[in-house]
């Protein structure tokens, strides 16, 4: 019996996502044996500093990629928003699964919405993208760092450390915690991270058998959207060091891409949007990136 070993982070959300991919693989290939290889990454272990300060979201991938290179795993499953814009050789993304809700969720035990927060309320997030949009919408708020997995962050809220926190809707709902969401933060006022809500499979792109095995899990509609978002981010040379947000949505046969570059320090933001054929998401992403740069985003990117 053929076996596929999936490298995964140990967090509850990462394990859920990897088991979801494993289930899809078993359904598509009856008789295939799929097992998880849980691993800890530096991004999971260092929680006293922001991701930007310790090297970025790529920290969540490196140990999993090394496991594949060592022959300890055949593939890895990631939240696509954590995957760098450029993959190292020989890696590829053969499958981007159907996207979950890409929105951010406003979570609070006391207040029903962002607007309902009192002046000076404490909001937890370590995401520069979320901080930038919070600064733009509510410059009076106290923004406090918040690291850890979903359950850890909720526990910190429940223990009174924050008046509200912002988390991805997809992560909460995948863990059965959707009832904690009191409001969705949605376009056009609020934009998510590029590829937020999407799960991707990474493997050796030169391994034709693995590439074919995962191809059936790929969702073309999701891939078109996230490729536009990632193309925009790539053209801006965006990373977790810079507040960049993007969301592509279907509009008939076309994609409508909205993008934002912000400042986490003072709430300044530059926005742009465009519609283009879904058959060429890369061009659409590059177009919106150019519009952002032409509107002054370069000044924020170089801060």
From Swiss-Prot:
The UniProt entry, under InterPro entries, shows: HemC, Porphobilin_deaminase_cofac_BS, Porphobilin_deaminase_N, Porphobilinogen_deaminase_C, Porphobilinogen_deaminase_C_sf
Question: What are the boundaries of the signal sequence?
Answer: none
Q: Where does the record place the modification S-(dipyrrolylmethanemethyl)cysteine?
A: 240
* Keyword Transferase found: yes
Swiss-Prot/TrEMBL cofactor(s): dipyrromethane
What remark does the entry make about the cofactor? Binds 1 dipyrromethane group covalently.
Q: Which Pfam families match?
A: Porphobil_deam, Porphobil_deamC
Q: What is its EC number?
A: 2.5.1.61
Q: Which UniProt keywords apply?
A: Porphyrin biosynthesis, Transferase
Q: In which pathway does it act?
A: Porphyrin-containing compound metabolism; protoporphyrin-IX biosynthesis; coproporphyrinogen-III from 5-aminolevulinate: step 2/4
Q: From the Swiss-Prot or TrEMBL record, what is one GO molecular function term?
A: hydroxymethylbilane synthase activity
Among its keywords, does the record have Transferase? yes
* Catalysis: reaction(s): 4 porphobilinogen + H2O = hydroxymethylbilane + 4 NH4(+)
Q: What else is known?
A: The porphobilinogen subunits are added to the dipyrromethane group.
Q: Which HAMAP family match?
A: Porphobil_deam
Query: What is this protein's name?
Result: Porphobilinogen deaminase
What is the species of this protein? Answer: Stenotrophomonas maltophilia (strain R551-3)
């Amino acid at each position: 019996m053929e076996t596929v070993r999936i490298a995964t982070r140990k967090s509850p959300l990462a394990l859920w996502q990897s088991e979801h991919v494993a289930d899809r693989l078993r359904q598509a290939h009856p008789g295939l044996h799929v097992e998880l290889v849980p691993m800890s990454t530096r991004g999971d272990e260092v929680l006293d500093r922001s991701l930007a300060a310790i090297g970025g979201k790529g920290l969540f991938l490196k140990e999993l990629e090394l496991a594949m290179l060592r022959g300890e795993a055949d593939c890895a499953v990631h939240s696509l928003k954590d995957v760098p814009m450029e993959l190292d050789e020989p890696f590829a993304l053969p499958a981007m699964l159907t996207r979950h809700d890409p929105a951010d969720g406003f979570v609070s035990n006391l207040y029903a919405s962002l607007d309902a927060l009192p002046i000076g309320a404490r909001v937890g997030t370590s995401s520069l993208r979320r901080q930038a949009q919070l600064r733009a919408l509510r410059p009076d708020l106290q923004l406090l760092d918040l690291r850890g997995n979903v359950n850890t962050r909720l526990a910190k809220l429940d223990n009174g450390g924050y008046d509200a926190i912002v988390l991805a809707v997809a992560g909460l709902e995948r863990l059965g915690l959707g009832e904690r969401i009191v409001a969705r933060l949605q376009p056009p006022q609020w934009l998510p991270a590029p590829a937020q809500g999407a799960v991707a499979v990474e493997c050796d792109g030169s391994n034709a058998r693995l590439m074919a095995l995962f191809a059936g899990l790929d969702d073309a509609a999701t891939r078109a959207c996230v490729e536009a978002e990632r193309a925009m981010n790539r053209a801006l040379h965006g990373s977790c060091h810079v507040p960049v947000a993007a969301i592509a949505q279907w509009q008939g046969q076309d994609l409508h891409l909205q993008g934002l570059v912000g400042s986490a320090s003072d709430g300044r933001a530059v926005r742009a949007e465009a519609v283009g054929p879904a058959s060429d998401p890369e061009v659409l992403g590059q177009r919106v990136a150019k519009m952002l740069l032409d509107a002054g985003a370069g000044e924020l990117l170089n801060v």
